[in-house]
Amino acid sequence: VKLAGKKCKICCTRKTIPNLRVIQKYAVKLGGGTNHRFNLSDEFLIKDNHIASSNIRDFVSLAIKNKKGRKITVEVDNLNQLRAIMGLKFNTVLFDNMNINNLKAGVKIAKKYYETEASGNINLKTVKSVAATGVDRISIGRITHSPSAIDLKLEI
């Protein structure tokens, strides 16, 4: 969280250990992170597998038409997908597995109109450079799906 700086939020994802979601999300908050999605019912999350079955602009337009008060996040993995959805009324662009140069370019294009989020293969070595692109938040799945154990012992 400290590596990302004060302007960029670190978020966990929906990927949690079965039956431990509430506890893991609480632990993220205690550690200074943010919970922005508890599950898929919180918002429309349009991912690459949805887009593969349709034109990205058409799919996002359909979600906008049926959103019923929920926010919409659209995952893009290249700048062409981003350009295709610009101008549509949704909430967040999720840049997935993009290299730093493309991420920086994407944030520059989208930042005025949408919240921005980066995700995919982000770790302690890369989080600072990802935050420096200007994204609003970074979601890191390994916070909840692959937590490391602490060495805790009690000696008497």
Predicted regions, residues:
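Active-site loop ensemble at the mouth of alpha/beta enzyme cores that anchors a bound cofactor
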Residues: 153-156
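Short secondary-structure boundary segments
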Residues: 97, 120, 142
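Acidic/glycine-rich phosphate/pyrophosphate-binding loops and surrounding catalytic core
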Residues: 1-88, 92, 101-109, 113-118, ...
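Cys/His-rich Zn2+-binding cysteine-cluster or related metal-binding knuckle/ribbon modules and their
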Residues: 124
